[in-house]
Amino acid sequence: MNTKPKFIYSTLIATTPEKLWAALTDPAFTTQYWGGTSLESDWKVGSRIVFRWQGKIVHDDTILKSEPPRLLSYSFHPLQFEEFLSEPPSRVTFAIEEFTGISKRQGPVVKLTVTHEDFPDDSKVFPKICNGWPDILSSLKTLLETGKAIEFEW
């Protein structure tokens, strides 16, 4: 039985898979809903992904899977906090699927499922992401559905 910490969050978003993919991968979008953080990469497997906040690199990770516009996975290792530096990278995966469980009259709907896993048992990062992901994903959803993100600061 696997007892490692794992975070799973699903939400429905009134958008298309392509628009959601763009929001996850375009720094012009990520800075709007991720507290000013730009995610920069060419989004190819094995490539570097850099998280930049206020001009500083706060993550330097690797793309593990990239299947536009359906699946994105990368390593996750925060660099901005001393207490996290000794912890090995974890893994975050974004699965995007068209949702057909409700009427399509309002337009396309996708289901986004974020899975964040591969944490050590005594992870200091895990409790932080459990608080952070709901904020980020709620802001992403709001941006895609209304055109304006929820503003917050780290």
Where are these regions (language model features)?
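Amphipathic, soluble alpha-helical interaction motifs
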Residues: 33, 139, 143-146
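Glycine-rich portal/gate segments that line the openings of hydrophobic small-molecule binding cavities
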Residues: 41-80
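Intrinsic-disorder/low-complexity, polar/charged segments enriched in Ser/Thr/Lys/Arg/Asp/Glu/Gln
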Residues: 4-10, 48, 58, 71, ...
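Generic structural detector for well-ordered beta-strands
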Residues: 8-14, 50-52, 62, 95
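Beta-strand/loop substructures that line and gate deep hydrophobic ligand-binding cavities in soluble
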Residues: 81-134, 140, 151-154
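Hydrophobic pocket/interface hotspot
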Residues: 20-21, 30, 49, 63, ...
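Hydrophobic ligand-binding cavity/cleft-lining segments
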Residues: 1-40
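Short solvent-exposed loop/turn micro-motifs enriched in small/polar/acidic residues
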Residues: 4, 33-34, 42-44, 56, ...
